[in-house]
Swiss-Prot record:
Gene name, Swiss-Prot/TrEMBL: tig
Keyword hit for Cell division: yes
EC class (word): isomerase
InterPro entries per UniProt: PPIase_dom_sf (IPR046357), PPIase_FKBP_dom (IPR001179), Trig_fac (IPR005215), Trigger_fac_C (IPR008880), Trigger_fac_C_sf (IPR037041), Trigger_fac_ribosome-bd_bac (IPR008881), Trigger_fac_ribosome-bd_sf (IPR036611), Trigger_fact/SurA_dom_sf (IPR027304)
The protein, known as: Trigger factor
Amino acid sequence: MKSAVENLEPTRVKLTVEVAFDELKASLDHAYQHIAQQVNVPGFRKGKVPPRVIDQRVGRAAVVEHAVNDALPDFYRQAVTESELKVLGQPEVEVTGVPDTTSGELTFTAEVDVRPDFTLPALADLELEVDDVAVTDDDVAERLDLLRQRYGTLTGVDRAAETGDYVVIDMTATIDGEEVDTVSGVSYEIGSGNMLDGLDEALVGLAADETATFSAPLAGGDRAGEAADVSVTVTAVKVQELPEADDDFAQLASEFDTLEELQADLRTQISDAKVNNQAVQARDRLLEKLVEATDFPLPQGVIEAEIHRHLESEGRLEDDEHREEVREEATQALRRQLVLDVLADQVSVQVNQNELVEFLLRTAQQYRVDPNEFITNADKTGQIPSFVAELARNKSLAVALRDVRVVDASGNAVDLTSFIGSEETDAEDAAEGVESVEVDLSAAAEDDAEETSDEPAAEDTATEDEAAKA
């Protein structure tokens, strides 16, 4: 097989591939076997029809066509690998030459989007700032109040409602005089803002058995987003009474005998949470800094395909305003993905078998499916490379943070080793025989984009199987 690459744009190339007739032999043999299973020929059992009879009954040309369709995806992938292309999405394939029944070459072209070339800034030159981990008395008091609220009781009061009160309400929503929704006996904390826009303002000042009206877009149902006239009636006003913060409460709400012990434990919990948050902040801020520091063209075909997939899934293909919102999201998501792909290459990320298995088990649990069934299906549908690539992208940030200076708001160096590992821990994994999984970000990017394809079926054969995003 011979192949050549022509650069059409910074993010798009044209592959020209030539395949000698002899290289189609395996596909021709497979074509004969497949056709033998499909045809009924008197005197022969299914699957046992010899090639010469198939040539007579079906035609050698049909066998060659079957072989070409079967072989083309593999030859395309081989050409991509040999040319060291980082492809994104599906190719547009055009078969330009088909061998005759006994000789000739298979020739085809494939135009495909590719990852642009760009360089990331030197990691050793970067400095990231994260929050301090010092725990204040106010932090402990706030956490203690949250715990007290879990054990609080609601008591009715005979006065107008205020922010922070709990009210029991009945609501009716109408559009053009037609009742579209109604609820009754709902308990709501004024100021929480987790129901309709304008509800908090309408409730403040209402006493039991008083009613107010306001307008707001509906938050759910068949008429979601439409403006409605809402009538709300308060049937009860209640305040939350919290238990005293004392030793008795400590014994009620925890395993500790004294309030002092409970407060010490809360302080430890808060400190641990802040340390964890430092690692999250460092990861997010590293990605943000790398994206800001790089400028590169994006393949618009990949972005348009993602926009179409997103809008189609929501049934909003004609919503131009939402299209622009999705375009911005898709553009930023692709930019982050490409930065992570380059970073994974730069720091030579390895995903081991244990990490992959843990990820698959977590994902199966997330979707509430049997782990064995999920893993089997993922392998059968070709999703494993995408999962490995996603793990590699995430892991690349942790590995890269080893070379970046991280400080807290007070200027103190922050040690994230317990979260990001080290070369020593990597060596220990290798010594224990933890097998690494091959990371192919190019194939995974092709898989991810296949979901968005609108190409004809004949061209679909030139790509990997569809892969889900995890």
